[in-house]
């Protein structure tokens, strides 16, 4: 039987770190040791930042983004085009689009995608709020920026059906050859999507 080599407080730190995505027990142990070694330079500021996050970070009541203000900085930015709402599954997708400067519109975070196998149904997502936003006269386009997975496509079709009565154009991200990609390395599904969505050159 293995014996604990650290005190209960350190074991608790390791246990909590191991709950983070991408950190298994071994990586969590290394991260904990690094934090302890850099106590003043890293652990104290990290603890302070986490406390601020607990106290100040909120979910935007309009789009579902997370921010220290509500509505969030994206929703209140006057330079954003209010006619376009980009629908994403989660906040990480919103941040990815923002890093790429891919959209000047506003966003709507669903919270997940429909997944019957995981027990995620329409009632678990913010689809009703999206439909309500789509009926705003200012809104003219809904961009479905969802993953090219079965769950993502199912969610896109479900939302499209619900938006039939709204006076908006529903578009989705193109799927196909990535920038810098070589055809020989792409899977059949990606190549088929690229051929279907080809554009004039």
Swiss-Prot record:
Name of this protein: Recombination protein RecR
The answer to whether the entry has keyword NAD is: no
Pfam families registered for this protein in UniProt:
RecR_C (PF21175), RecR_HhH (PF21176), RecR_ZnF (PF02132), Toprim_4 (PF13662)
- This chain is encoded by the gene named recR
Q: Which GO BP terms sit in this record?
A: DNA recombination; DNA repair
Q: Say which family it is in.
A: Belongs to the RecR family.
Zinc fingers (C4-type), as residue ranges, are 60-75
Keyword Magnesium assigned: no
**Xref: PANTHER family:** RECOMBINATION PROTEIN RECR
Output the NCBIfam families linked to this UniProt entry. Answer: recR (TIGR00615)
Q: What does this protein do?
A: May play a role in DNA repair. It seems to be involved in an RecBC-independent recombinational process of DNA repair. It may act with RecF and RecO.
HAMAP family, alphabetically?
RecR
Q: Report the GO molecular function annotations.
A: DNA binding; zinc ion binding
- The highest taxon in the source lineage is Bacteria
- Per the UniProt record, the source organism is Rhodopseudomonas palustris (strain BisA53)
Q: Where is the Toprim domain?
A: 83-178
Keywords linked to the UniProt accession: DNA damage, DNA recombination, DNA repair, Metal-binding, Zinc, Zinc-finger
């Amino acid at each position: 039987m293995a014996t604990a080599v650290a005190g209960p407080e350190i074991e608790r730190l390791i246990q909590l770190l191991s709950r983070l995505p991408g950190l298994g027990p071994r990586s969590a142990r290394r991260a904990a040791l690094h934090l302890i070694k850099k106590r003043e330079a890293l652990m104290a500021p990290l603890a302070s930042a986490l406390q601020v996050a607990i106290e100040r970070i909120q979910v935007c009541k309009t789009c579902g983004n997370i921010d220290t203000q509500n509505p969030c900085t994206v929703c209140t930015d006057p330079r954003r085009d209010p006619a376009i709402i980009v629908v994403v599954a989660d906040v990480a997708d919103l941040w990815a689009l923002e890093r790429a400067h891919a959209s000047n519109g506003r966003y709507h975070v669903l919270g997940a995608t429909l997944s019957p196998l995981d027990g995620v149904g329409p009632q678990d997502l913010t689809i009703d709020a999206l439909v309500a936003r789509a009926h705003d006269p200012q809104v003219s386009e809904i961009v479905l920026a969802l993953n090219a997975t079965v769950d993502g496509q199912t969610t896109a079709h479900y939302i499209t059906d619900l938006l039939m009565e709204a006076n908006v154009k529903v578009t989705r991200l193109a799927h196909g050859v990535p920038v810098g990609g070589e055809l020989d390395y792409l899977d059949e599904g990606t190549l088929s999507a690229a051929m279907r969505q080809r554009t004039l050159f």
